[in-house]
Swiss-Prot record:
Protein name per the record: Autoinducer-2 kinase
Catalytic reactions on record: (S)-4,5-dihydroxypentane-2,3-dione + ATP = (2S)-2-hydroxy-3,4-dioxopentyl phosphate + ADP + H(+)
Domain of life, per lineage: Bacteria
Keyword Transferase belongs to the record: yes
Family statement: Belongs to the FGGY kinase family.
Gene: lsrK
EC number: 2.7.1.189
Gene Ontology biological process: carbohydrate metabolic process; quorum sensing
GO molecular function, one term: autoinducer-2 kinase activity
Amino acid sequence: MSQLDTTTPSGDYLMALDAGTGSVRAVIFDLNGNQIAAGQAEWLHLPVPDVPGSMEFDLTTNWQLTCQCIRQALHLAKLPASAIRAVAACSMREGIVLYDRSGTPIWACANVDARASREVSELKELHNNGFELEIYQCSGQTLALSAMPRLLWLAHYRPDIYRQAGTLTMISDWLANMLSGELAVDPSNAGTTGMLDLVTRNWQPNLLEMAGLRADILSPVKETGTLLGHVTAKAAQECGLLAGTPVVMGGGDVQLGCLGLGVVHAGQTAVLGGTFWQQVVNLPQPIIDPNMNTRINPHVIPGMVQAESISFFTGLTMRWFRDAFCAEEKLLAQRLGIDTYSLLEDMAARVPAGAYGVMPIFSDVMQFKSWYHAAPSFINLSLDPEKCNKATLFRALEENAAIVSACNLAQIAEFSGVKASSVVFAGGGAKGKLWSQILADVTGVPVKVPVVKEATALGCAIAAGVGVGLYEALDKTGERLVRWEREYIPNTEHKALYQAAKTNWQAVYTDQLGLVDCGLTTSLWKAPGL
């Protein structure tokens, strides 16, 4: 929960519903972009028994949790429901929801549901093994996390659900539907299904037809910031919002996060440091990576696309290290009243740049067409406890995350011609002052850190405000509301050192992938169908 002693003179407020992988939040903002209050609840996406890789999205429980968050946010803000001028929803991407022909939700899965591994392989073989390339050239997506293999899985194993299905949306659209009763998708989130055209920002039914799937389940497409409907009497009773409150189209979490960071113009670059690290570059026109290493998504800004290269489990790796090895530091941080990561950063700051040559092996650079990683490990450890200890390993992890990030950005620059002149660093990772400086040193460009680091909800609130005329436009409002906390200038003395570390890491990582290929080690993560 977060609360600020600030009010909007008019008494107008906006609500964002943010459905993340691990939790759902209802966040209230004033019109100046200040967060007033937030209600939050964790949720779990449980596997279906005897369905390997499944990650079911519990529609009933998760709506109840959302309603709980809305009521909590209103209570903490000490606001009547009538103060909320509009609401919009955003969510993790790739997660889909199916509805029957009467509009009732009947099935859903979360973002990294991997049950359809066999179906991915099956679809890849279509058109003389050229179907995935056709999908990518149209949508900027591969089959790895797209909706088509999941629909094919339903046709194979749950034909009852497949036959009943009348409409498909994303999870953000499901929240909007539960509030308003209306069904539509926005391009930024629906683009991750692999069934939306990057240029027209509309569905491509022929892709489903080529896969032998039904193309009659595609809902209307409405741009982010468009009025969808109004809170129904039933929804008002369940969640505590006022009946008749406008419900506005939201979108995908990363794209709305970029809006909240003011990353709205071609050439701008952001690194969003959460569980995954997303390296995002706004492209001047829809183009694709000829090597198919990078995904291309519609931005929430009409006509704009984003190249997105993902580092896998970066934040999760840091949490694992903290919880597995730093019990002492957690207790000390608690006694000092500081965050454990801050304490670990203070320790790591005393370690020389380069971390004595220790090489973490966790996420690879994104290879979207053949997406898998080596087994987690540390390479080149020393038995000297003065040089090889928790502080060294923690610094090595931060440096490696920055190296992978720089490689991902270089990969985007290679096919797009767009090279970052500065980077906006946001998300939980941006709280680390040492990490922010390391990112600047490794990338060689200034790194700007915003005041609001979890910007997705703010971007979603901006969409809500645009939808009811409280703001003029998405891009202008995003630029106006973002405020900067600090900027980090690259230390040129570290450039050659980190370049050498990157070259060494790339060579070692290639060898480590070979161990996975031989079946000697287990991949950190492997995309369905590999």
